Amino acid sequence: MTLEEVRGQDTVPESTARMQGAGKALHELLLSAQRQGCLTAGVYESAKVLNVDPDNVTFCVLAAGEEDEGDIALQIHFTLIQAFCCENDIDIVRVGDVQRLAAIVGAGEEAGAPGDLHCILISNPNEDAWKDPALEKLSLFCEESRSVNDWVPSITLPE
């Protein structure tokens, strides 16, 4: 039996539960960040925030559905944002359901159209470290993913 086979046997139920936990934590974090007014939505808006104050950004969500796979410009933006986040120790995840993300965050005046939800940044509301349990859970999830060379893990949001 190879190491991959042993790992595959042990981690299938664990990884499913881990993924569901991360999805629920992301849902909670998005709602909490929106309530506190520390959520930035949109690729260009996020790039501006990352350029001006990267030390204040705590988490990044990249969202793209199947219809966005052919959008070369969006993929280039994602690559640049991922590189910037990795360089500045900002945890980052991918979500494959932009419509579900729009339902959680809401496409209000702040977010604009659902097309503006391809990148979401969560910032600290003030100078003090933000102690959100969902953020801590997601940071641990990202750290565990990086330990197995999954630098931008994908998360499925709960229904």
From Swiss-Prot:
Phenotype for residue 89 to K: Reduced growth inhibition activity
Outcome after substituting residue 83 to R: 30-fold reduction in homodimerization affinity and 90% decrease in growth inhibition activity and ability to stop cell cycle
Chain's role: Involved in the regulation of growth and apoptosis. Mediates activation of stress-responsive MTK1/MEKK4 MAPKKK.
Subunit annotation: Undergoes concentration-dependent homodimerization, which is required for growth inhibititory activity and enhances interaction with PCNA. Interacts with GADD45GIP1. Interacts with PCNA.
Domain notes: Two central helices mediate homodimerization through parallel packing.
BP GO annotations: apoptotic process; cell differentiation; positive regulation of apoptotic process; positive regulation of cold-induced thermogenesis; positive regulation of JNK cascade; positive regulation of p38MAPK cascade; regulation of cell cycle
Superkingdom, natural source: Eukaryota
Annotated region described as Homodimerization, given as residue ranges: 43-86
SUPFAM superfamilies: L30e-like
Any Gene Ontology CC annotation: nucleus
Keywords, ordered alphabetically: Apoptosis, Developmental protein, Differentiation
Protein name from the UniProt record: Growth arrest and DNA damage-inducible protein GADD45 gamma
Mutagenesis or variant effect for residue 76 to E: 30-fold reduction in homodimerization affinity and 90% decrease in growth inhibition activity and ability to stop cell cycle
Family of this protein: Belongs to the GADD45 family.
Native organism: Homo sapiens (Human)
